[in-house]
C-alpha cells in the first residue's frame, strides 16, 4: 500500500486575478446580486439615519427637562413619541430589507456552489486518466466538497458585509460632517492607523490561508485511502504507520490553520483598541463643544453613536478581508481544476470515422509511448489482430501489457506509430463512440451502491429485466444471485462488501455480457477467485468471446492456452508471438514463464 501524505506542489496564487475571475463568474447572477446589494444599501441607510432622528428626541427631552427645571416649560412627550414611532418604523424597514437581502444572498451563494459542483462533476468526465493517476482521490474530492463549501460560505457573508460596511462608512461620514467637521477630523485620524494594521495582517496571513486549503486536500486523501484499504492496514498491522503519516499531515494542517486564524484573530483586538482611543477623544472634545453651546446634546449623542458605527464597519472590513482570503484560496483551487487541460472528446470532422465500422480488426503499427517524455514504456509494438480472434498479452510486471489496453481505448495517445480499427486510426473516432465498442472486465471490480439489477444494467441502461437476467445466466451468476436476500433487488452497500470478491467478478462479467461490445478486454479477470468460480467464469467467457475480438491480459497462463494468438511482451516490446503450442515448442521466454507456473504439468 503506498504511503500517503505527499503533497502536490502548489503553484503561486494570484489573489487579484482569482477575485476578478470570480466577479466574472458572478455576472450570470447579476440580477440577484444587484437586487441584494440594493436591499443591503437600503437597510444600511435606515440604520444610519436612526441616530440622527434619535438625536431630535434626545434634544427635545433635554431641552424640555431644563425648561421644566427653570419653570419656563415642560417636556413634549407627544413630539418625542412621534419621533420614536417614526424611528421604530425605520428600524423595522431596515430589518425587513436586511432579511430580504440575506435571503437573496443565501440563494445566490447556493446557486454558485451548485453550478461549481456541476461543472466540477462534468469536468471530471472530460479529464484525461493521467490527471487522476497523479493525484489522490481525496485531493480531487476536496475540490468539490471543502473548496466549494468554503467558497459558498465566504461568498454569502463577504459580499453582504463588504457592501454594508462601505455603505455604512460613507453614510456615517456624511452624517458626522453634517454635525461637526472638526469632530469628524478627529474621528478620521483612526482610519489610516486601522487600514495600515489590516494590510499588514492580510499580507502575513494570506500564505497560511493558501497552505491551509492545500493541505486539507492531502488530509482528505489520506483519510479516503486508509478507509478504502482498512482491511490491508489491519492485515499488515500498519495502524501505527498510517497514524504517523496522518499525524504528520494533520500537524501541517494544524500549523497553517493556527497561524492563519491567529493572525486574522489579531485584527479585532487591535481594531477595538484603536477604535476606543478615537471614541475617547471624540467624547472629550464633544463634551467641550456641548459645554460651549457649539452643538446640542442630541448631536453629541448622535455623533458618539456614529463614531461607534464608523469603527464597526472598519472592524467588519477586517473580517471581510479574512473571508476574502479564504474565498480566494478556495476559488483558485476550483478554477485551477476547471482550467485543467481536457481530453479531445471529438475527432476531426474531416477525418471522423463511423463507429459502426468497428468489427474487431485491430492493428498496432510501430507504437511508441511513455507516460513521461524521459521514460518510454512501449518501444516498438506491432501486431495484427483479425476479427473474432482471442489475443492473449502476457509478460512480467511492467512489460507494458495494461498500457497497451489504455492506448487502445485512448486513455492515452501514442507518441508515435498508430493503432487502427478496421483501417481507421483510433484518433479518428470520437472518444465516447470509440469506447462504446469495448467491453471491459478489470482486475479491480467496480460496483456502485444500488441493487444487483441496477449494477448489471449499467452495461446497457435500456436493457429489460429479462435481458439482465439472461446476461447473469450467461455469466453463471444467476444461481448465486437468487440465493441472496432479495435476489436481483438486493441492495449492494457502498463498496459492495456484502458480496464476495468472486461474486463481484461474476457481476461485472454479466454487466459486460449485457453491453454486447465488439471488442472485449479482460484484465486479470479471474485472478481473484477460487478454482471452481474460475471454471464457471471461463465457461461463460468462452461463450461471450465467440465471434468477438478479445484481449486477455493475465499472469495465470492456464486461462489463455486456447488463445488464437499470444503476444509475449518484455520491456515494452513483443519478443515472441504465436499459439501456445508454437511458443512452447520454441522454448523461449514464454516457455520459461509457463514452466515456472506449471512445471509439474510440463514434466
Where are these regions (language model features)?
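Juxtamembrane loop-to-helix connectors within ABC transporter transmembrane domains
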Residues: 17-18, 26, 105, 125-170, ...
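Hydrophobic alpha-helical transmembrane bundles that constitute the permease/transmembrane domains
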Residues: 41-49, 91-99, 151-154, 158-170, ...
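An intracellular "coupling" helix at the cytosolic face of ABC transporter transmembrane type-1 domains
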Residues: 28, 129-130, 148-155, 159, ...
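Helix-loop-helix
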Residues: 64, 175-189, 259-333, 337-338
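Transmembrane helices of ABC transporter permease
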Residues: 28, 32-45, 157-211, 282-295, ...
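Short intracellular "coupling" helices and adjacent cytoplasmic loop segments at the cytosolic face
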Residues: 2-10, 110, 118-142, 146-148, ...
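ABC-type nucleotide-binding domain
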Residues: 355-603
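Transmembrane helix-loop-helix hairpins at lipid-water interfaces of multipass membrane proteins
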Residues: 33-97, 178-182, 293-297
Amino acid at each position: 500500500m503506498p504511503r500517503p501524505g505527499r503533497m502536490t506542489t502548489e503553484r503561486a496564487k494570484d489573489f487579484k486575478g482569482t477575485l476578478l475571475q470570480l466577479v466574472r463568474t458572478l455576472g450570470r447572477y447579476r440580477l440577484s446580486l444587484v437586487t441584494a446589494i440594493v436591499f443591503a444599501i437600503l437597510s444600511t441607510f435606515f440604520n444610519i439615519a436612526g441616530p440622527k432622528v434619535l438625536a431630535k428626541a434626545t434634544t427635545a427631552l433635554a431641552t424640555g427637562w431644563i425648561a421644566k427645571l427653570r419653570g419656563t416649560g415642560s417636556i413634549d412627550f407627544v413630539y418625542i413619541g412621534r419621533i420614536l414611532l417614526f424611528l421604530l418604523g425605520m428600524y423595522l424597514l431596515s430589518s425587513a430589507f436586511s432579511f430580504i437581502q440575506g435571503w437573496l444572498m443565501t440563494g445566490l451563494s447556493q446557486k454558485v456552489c451548485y453550478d461549481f459542483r456541476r461543472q466540477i462533476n462534468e469536468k471530471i468526465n472530460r479529464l484525461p486518466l493521467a490527471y487522476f493517476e497523479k493525484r489522490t482521490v481525496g485531493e480531487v474530492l476536496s475540490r468539490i466538497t471543502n473548496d466549494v463549501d468554503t467558497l459558498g460560505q465566504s461568498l454569502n457573508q463577504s459580499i453582504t458585509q463588504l457592501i454594508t460596511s462601505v455603505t455604512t462608512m460613507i453614510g456615517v461620514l456624511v452624517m458626522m460632517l453634517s454635525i461637526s467637521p472638526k469632530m469628524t477630523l478627529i474621528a478620521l485620524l483612526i482610519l489610516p492607523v486601522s487600514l495600515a494594521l489590516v494590510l499588514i495582517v492580510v499580507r502575513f496571513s494570506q500564505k497560511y490561508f493558501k497552505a491551509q486549503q492545500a493541505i486539507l486536500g492531502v488530509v482528505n486523501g489520506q483519510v479516503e485511502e486508509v478507509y478504502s484499504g482498512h482491511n490491508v492496514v489491519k492485515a499488515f498491522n500498519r495502524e501505527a504507520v498510517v497514524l504517523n503519516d496522518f499525524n504528520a499531515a494533520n500537524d501541517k494542517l494544524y500549523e497553517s490553520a493556527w497561524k492563519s486564524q491567529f493572525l486574522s484573530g489579531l485584527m479585532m483586538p487591535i481594531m477595538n483598541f484603536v477604535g476606543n482611543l478615537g471614541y475617547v477623544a471624540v467624547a472629550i472634545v464633544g463634551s467641550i463643544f456641548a459645554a460651549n453651546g457649539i452643538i446640542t446634546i442630541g448631536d453629541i449623542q448622535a455623533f458618539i453613536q456614529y463614531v461607534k458605527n464608523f469603527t464597526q464597519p472598519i472592524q467588519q472590513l477586517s473580517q471581510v478581508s479574512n473571508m476574502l482570503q479564504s474565498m480566494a484560496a478556495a476559488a483558485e483551487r476550483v478554477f485551477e481544476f476547471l482550467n485543467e487541460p481536457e481530453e479531445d472528446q471529438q475527432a476531426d470532422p474531416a477525418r471522423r470515422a463511423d463507429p459502426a465500422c468497428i468489427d474487431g480488426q485491430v492493428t498496432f503499427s510501430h507504437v511508441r509511448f511513455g507516460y513521461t517524455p524521459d521514460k518510454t514504456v512501449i518501444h516498438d509494438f506491432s501486431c495484427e489482430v483479425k476479427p473474432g480472434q482471442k489475443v492473449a498479452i502476457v509478460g512480467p510486471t511492467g512489460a507494458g501489457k495494461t498500457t497497451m489496453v489504455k492506448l487502445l481505448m485512448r486513455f492515452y495517445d501514442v507518441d508515435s506509430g498508430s493503432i487502427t480499427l478496421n483501417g481507421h486510426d483510433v484518433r479518428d473516432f470520437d472518444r465516447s463512440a470509440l469506447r462504446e465498442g469495448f467491453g471491459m472486465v478489470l482486475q479491480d471490480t467496480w460496483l456502485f451502491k444500488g441493487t444487483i439489477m441496477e449494477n448489471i444494467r449499467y452495461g446497457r441502461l435500456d436493457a429489460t429485466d429479462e435481458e439482465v437476467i439472461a446476461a447473469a445466466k450467461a455469466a453463471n451468476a444467476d444461481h448465486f444471485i437468487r440465493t441472496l436476500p432479495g435476489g436481483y433487488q438486493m441492495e449492494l452497500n457502498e463498496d459492495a462488501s456484502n458480496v464476495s470478491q468472486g461474486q463481484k467478478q461474476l457481476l461485472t462479467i454479466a454487466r459486460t455480457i449485457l453491453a454486447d461490445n465488439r471488442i472485449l478486454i479482460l484484465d486479470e479477470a479471474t485472478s481473484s477467485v477460487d478454482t471452481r468460480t474460475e471454471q464457471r467464469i471461463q465457461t461463460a467467457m468462452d461463450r461471450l468471446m465467440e465471434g468477438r475480438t478479445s484481449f486477455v491480459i493475465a499472469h495465470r497462463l492456464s486461462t489463455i492456452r486456447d488463445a488464437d494468438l499470444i503476444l509475449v511482451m518484455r520491456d515494452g516490446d513483443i519478443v515472441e508471438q504465436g499459439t501456445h503450442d508454437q511458443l512452447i515448442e520454441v522454448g523461449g521466454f514464454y516457455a520459461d514463464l509457463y514452466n515456472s507456473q506449471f512445471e509439474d504439468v510440463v514434466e
